[in-house]
């Protein structure tokens, strides 16, 4: 769990090699980058709010790896973490985001009119479509490091801003601590609410402290636009609906997100952003757009095909189990989404998903007929 600086000072009584974590069995990005020399160089540093190197890496020390996805193994505790510990974060970001260099600049495009097609993904295969991102409010620590007071202030600010949304975005806020166990579980099962904080990544990084204090979900009346408050990020903004109309989902996402940003600005708050990293979020895997456009897609044949992982890789897509990051696929249904977050715009990422999903459906249909798919295997995007 996050420590104060007095604890860090105490640790400096021991030589760096005595404090260096045992990463010999680890398979995450942090463990690939962190050497005893780098640890020695950075361990005495801290951000203005007191976040230290050990706070950054703890989740990756406690969680050696993941069977489906190469985890990042570190978190930021505030906006300054990415700068103070850049010797660690920069190579991790480059590794995780396909060679994204410290000198590269990120691009943003939240104009849904720039998306080609996407309103006709076959609903016989695509069960639901979803676009999400995260946003952090400048001036507050991020969830691994924020205090109870900060968390409550973020909740208050967010609820005030969201209550100003109108039209088809109008809705209400449900605080986690005022929900019954059954209500909570129903929302989780329907994929509307974040899981209880059982994920070891959440626990080891300190994001689950004081749970469920100041956590909750805001959603519009027909549950197609949702905002999670104070889970892994200050805000997670989600647009979702049944079926394959990704264009509609993305349009609602862009409109809602733009309105939320305007509402925060009217209260003199802005989102953490810089030209190099785009939108700043807790996990380095979400930097840039923070955007994950995904579909729940039925691929009973392709899902078992030996070429499936390679096809996804070439399309710059990734698969998760039906229930999310820590789960397996049920009944041939996969959660397929863009693998990238940084170095591509929002529109480009959603376009990759739309185009890729169409090809996956074509392959599935071929396999249903007992035909080969070799000629459909794409080149690397």
From Swiss-Prot:
UniProt keyword Mitochondrion present: yes
Cross-link Glycyl lysine isopeptide (Lys-Gly) (interchain with G-Cter in ubiquitin) placement: 45, 101, 107, 381
A cellular component term, taken from the record's GO annotations: plasma membrane
Name assigned to this protein: Creatine kinase B-type
All residue ranges annotated as the Phosphagen kinase C-terminal domain in the record: 125-367
Occurrences of domain Phosphagen kinase N-terminal (ranges): 11-98
Species: Canis lupus familiaris
Entry EC number(s): 2.7.3.2
Modified residues (Phosphoserine): 4, 199
A molecular function GO annotation: creatine kinase activity
Catalytic activity: creatine + ATP = N-phosphocreatine + ADP + H(+)
Binding site for creatine: 72, 232, 285
Region span, Internal MTS-like signal: 130-138
Residue(s) carrying Phosphotyrosine: 125
Positions with a binding annotation for ATP: 128-132, 191, 236, 292, 320-325, 335
Gene Ontology biological process terms in this record: brain development; intracellular chloride ion homeostasis; phosphocreatine biosynthetic process
Keyword Transport: no
Residue numbers bearing the 3'-nitrotyrosine modification: 269
Subcellular location field: Cytoplasm, Cytosol; Mitochondrion; Cell membrane
The entry's keywords: ATP-binding, Cell membrane, Cytoplasm, Isopeptide bond, Kinase, Membrane, Mitochondrion, Nitration, Nucleotide-binding, Phosphoprotein, Transferase, Ubl conjugation
